[in-house]
C-alpha cells in the first residue's frame, strides 16, 4: 500500500508520542521533499523532525512533475508547497491514500481522485485495529499539546464514530 503524507499528520502524531501508529497502520509513509524541508529546516524544533531524518519507514521522494505542483499551487484552493507536492506525489505514485489535515488541500486532493484521510480518520482506524484503546484521550492531548484545532461538532461526531461519549 502506497501512502503519502503531508506535514501535519506526522507533526501532530509525533507531538503526542503516537507517530508509530502510521507505521503500524501503513508500514511505510512517503513524503515529498517540501514536507521534509518544512519539518527539518523550520528554524525551530518541530515534532517529528528527527524521525523523518532517521526512521527507515518514512521515505522522502522527489516530485517528477514540477509543473503539476505549480498548477496545484496556483489553483484557487490556495495551498502551500508541502500540500501541493504531497498531492502531486500521491498522483505520481498512484497512492492508495493521502494523509492530509488542511481542508483546502483535502478538497483539492479529493477533486483529483485521491483517497484522503486526516488525523482523526487515522485515529479512528487505529482504534478499529486495536492499536489504541480510546480516541478521546489522544484527541484531547492533540488539542492540548499540539494545538490541534477542530470544532465541537466534529469532536462529538468523531467520538460518536469511535463509540465513545464526549
Please give the residue ranges for each predicted region:
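Active-site-proximal, substrate-binding regions of enzyme catalytic domains
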Residues: 1-97, 103-106, 110-114, 153-159, ...
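Acidic, PIN/NYN-like endoribonuclease modules and their adjacent C-terminal/linker elements
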Residues: 106-166
Amino acid at each position: 500500500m502506497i501512502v503519502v503524507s503531508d506535514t501535519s499528520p506526522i507533526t501532530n502524531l509525533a507531538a503526542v508520542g503516537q507517530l508509530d501508529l502510521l507505521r503500524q497502520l501503513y508500514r511505510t509513509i512517503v513524503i515529498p521533499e517540501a514536507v521534509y524541508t518544512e519539518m527539518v529546516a523550520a528554524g525551530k524544533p518541530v515534532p517529528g523532525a528527527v524521525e523523518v531524518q532517521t526512521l527507515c519507514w518514512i521515505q522522502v521522494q522527489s516530485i517528477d512533475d514540477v509543473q503539476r505542483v505549480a498548477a496545484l499551487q496556483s489553483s484557487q484552493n490556495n495551498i502551500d508547497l508541502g500540500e501541493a507536492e504531497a498531492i502531486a506525489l500521491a498522483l505520481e505514485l498512484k497512492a492508495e491514500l493521502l494523509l492530509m489535515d488542511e481542508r483546502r488541500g483535502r478538497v483539492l486532493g479529493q477533486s483529483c481522485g485521491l483517497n484522503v484521510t486526516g488525523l482523526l480518520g487515522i485515529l479512528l482506524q487505529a482504534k478499529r485495529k486495536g492499536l489504541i484503546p480510546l480516541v478521546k484521550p489522544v484527541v484531547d492531548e492533540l488539542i492540548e499539546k499540539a494545538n490541534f484545532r477542530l470544532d465541537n461538532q466534529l469532536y462529538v461526531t468523531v467520538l460518536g464514530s469511535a463509540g465513545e461519549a464526549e
